[in-house]
């Protein structure tokens, strides 16, 4: 399959989506941040001096989805219909799993917006808690699902 972001001279270009059909597009991405028990408990018990960590991560994730095209060079700026973020507490592993669902009616998908949302949400958690645990790890950032568009639906293998 040829790369669509290169022109005839092998130089970068933004793909022309003008002739594509506007359809509903949805993307769901996820990722995890793991930390020590002290950091996990501080988040759960609202004991982080910088403020409410999980709520701040949700806001950061929403903001990131809206700014994706400003940071990813070939990503088209698109109007988002909604960004919904859910953070699951995983007490046994002292980790949090963040899910971002992004929805639009557009000529291109929102996979990058969902992935950006997850990444920035997790980085925000890291930033707010690094004073307690600098060894936190972010892992498994991935596209779980996408629907709409010419390529159809995608579901990650479990």
UniProtKB/Swiss-Prot annotation:
Task: Name the UniProt key words of this record, in alphabetical order.
Answer: Lyase, Molybdenum cofactor biosynthesis
Query: InterPro entries in the record, alphabetically?
Result: MoaC, MoaC_bact/euk, MoaC_sf, MoCo_biosynth_MoaA/MoaC, Mopterin_CF_biosynth-C_dom
Extract the GO molecular function terms from the UniProt entry.
Answer: cyclic pyranopterin monophosphate synthase activity
> What is the enzyme's class at the highest EC level?
lyase
Q: Which residues bind substrate?
A: 74-76, 112-113
State the superkingdom.
Bacteria
Protein's GO biological process: Mo-molybdopterin cofactor biosynthetic process
Pathway(s) annotated for this protein in UniProt: Cofactor biosynthesis; molybdopterin biosynthesis
Per the record, what are the reactions this protein catalyses?
A: (8S)-3',8-cyclo-7,8-dihydroguanosine 5'-triphosphate = cyclic pyranopterin phosphate + diphosphate
Q: Which Pfam families match?
A: MoaC
Gene3D superfamilies named among the record's database cross-references: Molybdopterin cofactor biosynthesis C (MoaC) domain
- The entry's active site is 127
What EC designation does it have?
Answer: 4.6.1.17
- UniProt family annotation: Belongs to the MoaC family.
The protein's role, per its UniProt record? Catalyzes the conversion of (8S)-3',8-cyclo-7,8-dihydroguanosine 5'-triphosphate to cyclic pyranopterin monophosphate (cPMP).
Q: Which PANTHER family match?
A: MOLYBDOPTERIN COFACTOR SYNTHESIS PROTEIN A (PTHR22960)
HAMAP family, alphabetized: MoaC_B
Q: How does it assemble?
A: Homohexamer; trimer of dimers.
* Name this protein carries in UniProt: Cyclic pyranopterin monophosphate synthase
**Organism encoding this protein:** Helicobacter pylori (strain J99 / ATCC 700824)
Tell me the lineage of the source organism: Bacteria, Pseudomonadati, Campylobacterota, Epsilonproteobacteria, Campylobacterales
Q: Which gene encodes it?
A: moaC
